[in-house]
């Protein structure tokens, strides 16, 4: 139910929403044609490589080679520019736990969260996710971080149900151009 009910009534889907955001973002970045598929293919390989190492991941033990992205019989189009391997499988669940002993304790310096509309018509910009930007500003402010790109050892986890959201998220977090 993340798609606006009125837009859903006209056939809009989450992959369709992400596809439009991705198209706009790639256009803004001046990435066109086969270069878009090349970027998405590399992101797919990265995602599957990481997931293949996690025993709790849907694709545990199943990394994908670059050629798999371009296999038209197994990686069908979903919503341009997204193909099947750009989309996560339907699955639920997430958790984050930090366990440590006192001598090795780490301090979580900042945390931020935000929400925004899923409606394509109500978005201020199509090339970013405002909630990510807002949550990052809150977390950086709470942590006293003025220049996140200059931090060493920064750990970031982004929700990337669609491969194309990773570069968009890194830009929205202020970690990439």
Regions from the PLM with identified roles:
Residues 120-124, 157-177:
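Short glycine/threonine-rich loop-to-helix capping motif typified by GTGT followed
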Residues 2-81:
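Glycine-rich, mobile lid/loop segments that gate access to catalytic sites or pores
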Residues 17, 35, 39, 131-135, ...:
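Generic recognition of stable, solvent-exposed alpha-helical segments in well-folded globular domains
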Residues 2-8, 28, 33, 41-46, ...:
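Condensing-enzyme catalytic core mediating Claisen C-C bond formation in acyl metabolism
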Residues 96, 131, 135-146, 164-173:
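Stable alpha-helical structural segments in soluble proteins, enriched in small hydrophobic residues
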Residues 111-114, 152-163:
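A short beta-alpha structural unit
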